[in-house]
Amino acid sequence: MGPHLLGRSSLLLLLLGMWWSVRPLCAVPKGLTKARWFEIQHIQPRLLQCNKAMSGVNNYTQHCKPENTFLHNVFQDVTAVCDMPNIICKNGRHNCHQSPKPVNLTQCNFIAGRYPDCRYHDDAQYKFFIVACDPPQKTDPPYHLVPVHLDKVV
């Protein structure tokens, strides 16, 4: 009976450990709104090497994010996409919006290292993007809707 219970406990601990390691990937860091976290993760007006740009993201989460996309645009222009017609997001919600024209962006993919020395491969692209938008929170800029999630690039 003892080893049987130990096996169940080990499995539970393994599952909890896996959940804990994945959970922070999408969690908004304390003290930030969803829109501000979106801006930190995905807005980079000027071209910047992924290794440097990702350090700003990874410092909030204390781990190497596996992949991330930076839109080379200003927050105001990305927010304007929230006024485009609604489309269905990957999660089935109806609060997504597609950019009316393609933009320069950089896809960063983790290749090696350990936080804080994360190393990334840069992939420059010119594509449309789809963002999820929600009403702003109290401390967000005063727009009707603000981007809170980069759903995909197309």
Swiss-Prot record:
Its main location: secreted. The keyword 4Fe-4S does not apply. The record marks 63 as: Facilitates cleavage of polynucleotide substrates. One of its GO terms (biological process) is antimicrobial humoral immune response mediated by antimicrobial peptide. It comes from Bos taurus. InterPro entries: RNaseA, RNaseA-like_dom_sf, RNaseA_AS, RNaseA_domain. GO terms for molecular function: endonuclease activity; nucleic acid binding; RNA nuclease activity. Interacts (via N-terminus) with bacterial lipopolysaccharide (LPS). Residues 1-27 form the signal peptide. It is found in: Secreted; Lysosome; Cytoplasmic granule. Optimum pH is 6.5. The active site is at 42 (proton acceptor), 149 (proton donor). Optimum temperature is 30 degrees Celsius. Activity declines with increasing temperature, with loss of stability at 90 degrees Celsius. Ribonuclease which shows a preference for the pyrimidines uridine and cytosine. Has potent antimicrobial activity against a range of Gram-positive and Gram-negative bacteria, including P.aeruginosa, A.baumanii, M.luteus, S.aureus, E.faecalis, E.faecium, S.saprophyticus and E.coli. Causes loss of bacterial membrane integrity, and also promotes agglutination of Gram-negative bacteria. Probably contributes to urinary tract sterility. Bactericidal activity is independent of RNase activity. Transmembrane segments: none annotated. Disulfide bonds join 50-108, 64-118, 82-133, 89-96. Belongs to the pancreatic ribonuclease family. Glycans are attached at residues 59, 104. One of its GO terms (cellular component) is lysosome. The keyword Transmembrane helix does not apply. The record marks 65 as: Critical for catalytic activity. Its EC number is 3.1.27.-. Substrate binds at residues 65-69, 90. The lineage of its organism: Eukaryota, Metazoa, Chordata, Craniata, Vertebrata. This is Ribonuclease K6. Keywords: Antibiotic, Antimicrobial, Disulfide bond, Endonuclease, Glycoprotein, Hydrolase, Lysosome, Nuclease, Secreted, Signal. Kidney (at protein level).
